[in-house]
Amino acid sequence: MKNILITGASQGIGKATAIEAAKAKMFVGINYNQNAKAADECLAEVKSAGGDGIILQCDVADSKAVISMFEQFKEKAGSIDAVFNN
C-alpha cells in the first residue's frame, strides 16, 4: 500500500484528491487547519471509498508544526510515498 499526505484535505480539491487516493487503495493523511468536522467527514468518505487514513491537524504556515505532522504521519503509515501540497 502506498501512502499519501494531503494538505488542506478536509474540503475542495484536497478532499477530492483524498477520495481518489482511497479508491487507489492508498493510506491517506488528511491535513486540516481549523475545520475538524470537515476532516472527520473526509475520513469517513475515504473509508467508504475503500481506503484508510489518519487526520492530522496542522497550520502549514508553521514549519515546526509541519515537521511534527510529517513525523506523525510516518509513524502511523510507515513511509511517505507522496505529498499533495494543496
Model-derived features: where do they sit?
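Aromatic pocket-lining residues of Rossmann-like dinucleotide-binding sites
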Residues: 21
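Glycine-rich phosphate-binding loop signature in dinucleotide/nucleotide-binding domains
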Residues: 73-78
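The beta1-alpha1 cofactor-binding region of Rossmann-like NAD(H)/NADP(H)-dependent oxidoreductases
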Residues: 36, 57-70
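Rossmann-fold scaffold of SDR-type NAD(P)-dependent oxidoreductases
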Residues: 7, 80-86
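Hydrophobic/aromatic anchor residues within beta-strands of the central parallel beta-sheet
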Residues: 53-55
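Conserved glycine-rich Rossmann-like NAD(P)H-binding loop of the short-chain dehydrogenase/reductase
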Residues: 26-41
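Conserved glycine-rich cofactor-binding loop
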Residues: 10-12
